[in-house]
Amino acid sequence: MLVVISPAKTLDYDNPAPTKQYTLPELVSHSAELIEVCKGLTPADIASLMSVSDKIAGLNAARFASWTPSFSLENAKQALFAFRGDVYTGLDADTLSPEELEYAQSHLRMLSGLYGVLKPLDLMQAYRLEMGTALGNGRGKNLYEFWGNLITDKLNEALSAQGDDILVNLASNEYFKAVKIKGIKGTLVNPVFKDAKNGQYKIISFYAKKARGLMARFILTTRTKTIEDLKRFDYDGYYYSPEQSTPCTPVFLREER
């Protein structure tokens, strides 16, 4: 089972990762092409393109300017420990055991606007470049056109290497749009998380994001291998709903809290 999650806007480069082990991103030559485009943007361009404040635009202009294709523990951090946000709160990577982290290297991938696909221990220099950004580049008008089939090909490689053909999509729509679904050589599973509110079960973004992280953790810590096993997910009050589910879209409900 291979799990795919989104990155996060919030980054933590202040606290050290719990391991010194690292790997290098495999698509970094493509990242370098994007960085060259981004280095040509002024802070005002970035503010407009990304709809961010002048302060965040200035920070990201500085990040683009200082980015280098040489990665080390001095200028980068392992991706799984650098990202912070609702999904990563649920995943709680800092408390994974060394064995679980090793398992994650084969069974977890993070999608990224700048890096394409990241393994948990891949070093990552700080950046902000969301997949939905309409950044014109030498390959097209946005990042979906830039990455083309590269992300799908990398996921197929990882899917083949980890031993079965199940890809669990716990990423957002914005990021999973970068995957060519028809090109995936396996079974795609799209879990859905709904919370009760005013008598109805609804997808509530904040809760759903955290639930995606919780399910990623469940898969890594229990070494889930089948869709049947996935239905046992019960973290934080969620339970499987056979009535609302279809074979490849398992739905998990939670009562109002």
From Swiss-Prot:
Database matches in InterPro entries: YaaA
UniProt GO BP: response to hydroperoxide
Disulfide-bond pairs as recorded: none
GO annotations of cellular component type: cytosol
Any single Pfam family the record assigns to this protein: H2O2_YaaD
Similarity comment: Belongs to the UPF0246 family.
HAMAP family according to UniProt: UPF0246 (MF_00652)
Protein name: UPF0246 protein Sama_0917
Organism whose genome encodes this protein: Shewanella amazonensis (strain ATCC BAA-1098 / SB2B)
Lineage, highest ranks first: Bacteria, Pseudomonadati, Pseudomonadota, Gammaproteobacteria, Alteromonadales
